[in-house]
Structures are given as C-alpha cells and as structure tokens.
Amino acid sequence: MQAQSFDPMRKASETIAMRPAIAHIHLQNLLHNYQTLRQRAEHAQIMAVVKADAYGHGLKCISQTLQQAGCECFAVTDASEGALLRSYLGKKASIVLLSGLFESAEVSTCQTHHLTPVITEEKHIQWLSEKSFTGQVWLKVDTGMQRLGAKHPEQLIQSCHQHQIALAGIMSHLACADTPAHPLNTVQADAFYQLHQDIAPHLPASLLNSAGLIALPQHKHDIVRPGIALYGAEPIPHEPIGLKPVMQLSGQVMQIRDVLKGSTLSYGASFTAKDDMTIALVCLGYGDGLPRTLSNQGYAEFQGQHLPIVGRICMDFCLLDVSGSDLEVNDTVTFWGESLSPNTVASLLDTIPYTLMTGINQRVPRIPIPPKPQPPFVADGAAGASG
C-alpha cells in the first residue's frame, strides 16, 4: 500500500482562512520529546502510542513525523484507527491495536491492513482462527489494574499454539505509574516479570507507559509504550524531564472594550467588575473544546502576561481581563503551549493533560509547524508483524 505524503505547508494553506481558533502542532518539539524518550529507553524499542487522533494532535502529521525520525512501531486503539494509520505509514510500520478486537468482523480488517491486535479472551482466538488469520497478536495480561487483560494467560498461550496463531509479545499496563511510590507499581511489575518468565520467556515483553519509563526504568523489558510524553505533557509533574508541549492552542482577539465598575460579564452574570476594566473577546469557547470549568479561574498568555478568563466561557468565545495590557484586536493569545504548559492548565481543573488535548475537537484546525531538517537516523526496532 502506498503511503500518503505529508506536506504540512499544504495543510496550513487549506485551513488558514478558517475560524481563527487554531492548534499549532510544533513537530520540532515532538522530535525533541521522542529523542528524550529514546535515550531513556536505552536498549528497549519504542512503541509510539498515537490513539485518539494522536491524543488530539492529528494522526497523520504525528505518525509520519515519528516514522521519519526512525520509529517503526505504533499503537492505536482499534482496527478502524489501525487501518487509517496504515494508509499514512505504508506497509513497513508495525501497528498494534491496544483495545484488541470488539467483534469478529474486525479480523478481516486486521488481515487486510496487516494489523497486530491485542488478545485477552478465548473468543478472540476463536475469531482469529475462524478467519484464518495469518498475522501476529499481542497477549495482554491483567496484573492488578482490573481493566483489560487476560486472567489466565497460560491458557490463551496454549490455545494460540493449538490454533497456530503467532504471538508477537506479552504486555500489561500499570495503574499508578504517575505515583511512583504507590505500592501497586511494585506488585504489578513483580507479577508481570514472574508471569513472563513462567509462561513466555521467549516472547518480547512490554510493561511501561510514559510515567513508567520515568519512575520504573528498571522494568523496561523489551518494548516501552510512551503516549502522553510524546506530546510534551510531563507524566510525573514533580519529576519533569524537559519535555516540550507539541500543541499550542490559540485564539484571536475579535473585540476589545472598556467596562465600568459593577458591570457583569457573560452568561449568568457570574463575574462582576470590581473596578473599571478592559476586556477582550477571544475566538475560542467550549464548542472548540476549551473546558468551561476554566471560567473565572483560568487564563491565557500574551507576551509573558497572564490574562484571566472572566465570566463564563461561551460556546464560541471567552472573555479576558486585559486591563493594562498592550493587546490589540487581531492579536493571538495562547491557552496552552510552551509558554503555558498543559500540566499547569490541568492542575487548575484537578484533571490531567490528556483530557485537555483530546478534548479539542475538529472545529479547531491543526496547523503543523514543520521541524528543522534532521540528520540521518538509525531506525528503532519494530514489534509485531507488519506484513
């Protein structure tokens, strides 16, 4: 299958005339993050997690940039995401489906597009066998998260052998890696190590996600699966490793006006001006994915200034207190990016950066900013069959 070419400047020209709420995708920062994680992974291979449209950043530009940097193994959620990713990356990349199979019909998609699904139940093996699946699968085991994972993996391994289904590796997932001192980390890591040694020592093993790679590097095994760290959010905020935000979410100033002391702002009159003030109407709202809970507590950044969000965020707009600022109509303010990290914004809402990034919807165009020319790379190893 011929990979579709990625031309970031063409994409920019197509979207520049749209509504002035934009997410710039800084691909140089993506490469910085990838190389930072590559160094930490040492001997382990990188399986780049690009599910949910690359955490809201745009699957095509993110995956192709990583592939050009030497990454050969990617993970998405399901067969539909996998088929789309295959069209972007061509036939050489390995593509793993972390959520596995939801129905038997997906086996045909996996076969056609050379996708490597995760299996967790006997029915998955039956589906694969019935469709004469000739690819590989990953076995996912539950070591304590109580989410997706086989409870009796030794039985599934035996069944795979009986049905002549090739295993690419064995994996599990950490529940508390972003809390390094949590005792469940050791419980899961020890359980996974022992399980791997007991039932599949010959298979590649994968346990660590982004936070795990930072907190538990001794458990790298053969393959690590960074996700959020690729996009520049620090997985463990109090242990930063110098990641750079890839997405810069911005909105353009549509109007500036003076309001008098005692005036109320926006829906519900939830903000009352304590003094005469100047406000700016910005083209970004909850209809774009800006969390409405930032109303009256969040802020935007402009030339190093923090401009408070005042009044309730509307579907299409929000209001900023710009008193004393040099801000003008048509200027652009940033809601998160390098100057205002997604970790900082998430902490205001007692949430995680994942929800911010994946919450920005398709009404906001992603404008890729091309990286600087890169030196020749040594390709990272692939995991699982790619056909």
Where are these regions (language model features)?
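Active-site anion/phosphate-binding pocket segments in diverse small-molecule metabolic enzymes
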Residues: Q2-L27, L31, E81, L101, ...
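Active-site-proximal beta-alpha core segment in soluble small-molecule metabolic enzymes
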Residues: A21-H24, L31-H32, Q39-D198, H202-P204, ...
